[in-house]
Amino acid sequence: SVPTVNFDGEEANPDTIVGVVPDYLDANSKQTGEGRFINETDVRRSAQVIVIGFDIADAIFPFVDPIGKWVQFGGRRYEVIGVMEEQGATMFESTDAHVYLPITTFDQAFPWVEKEGNGVNIATVPKDPLLTAQIVEEGTNVLRLRRGVPFNKPNDFGIMTPDKLIGNFQAVTGG
């Protein structure tokens, strides 16, 4: 289960912890509403920083500017550097209750995540859409190596491309 975020007696329950790199915003068409997002320096240093979703900020900082404040999360302290722009609920989920950590910080703080069957997602957007197949192939090769998948065995992970996502959506909606 996801730990609570605590500040000065207030607490909020995030629904997802996201370990990210700076390109996450572009790859997922998201923006910060206040402060800044995680940068390369944060990732390199495994900085103890956190970006919180709009609902998390609203719950624990109702009358206080959250930027620069320190919160407790998962037994560690993190400086709030940003608040995500309010997204609201979509057909799939609401990201307003997500929290974001540098990927290196996430790996240190939550090493058990993948081992307990929780998903790890990697999102990327090619600069040239015609390169999607090449990027999928390269990503597949890297993941197989990192995960130790033998040559003669199937992938132990999935890759979702825009075409597959649209196909899944059409299968569910009958469109």
What are these regions (language model features)?
Residues 1-2, 118:
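Membrane-proximal extracellular/periplasmic loop immediately following the first transmembrane helix
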Residues 3-8, 88-92, 167-169:
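A short acidic, helix-capping loop that chelates divalent metal ions and anchors anionic groups
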Residues 10-13, 44-45:
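A short, glycine/Asx- and small/polar-enriched loop/turn
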Residues 13-15, 157:
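Short active-site oxyanion
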Residues 18, 22-42, 46-152:
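Mid-to-C-terminal secondary-structure elements
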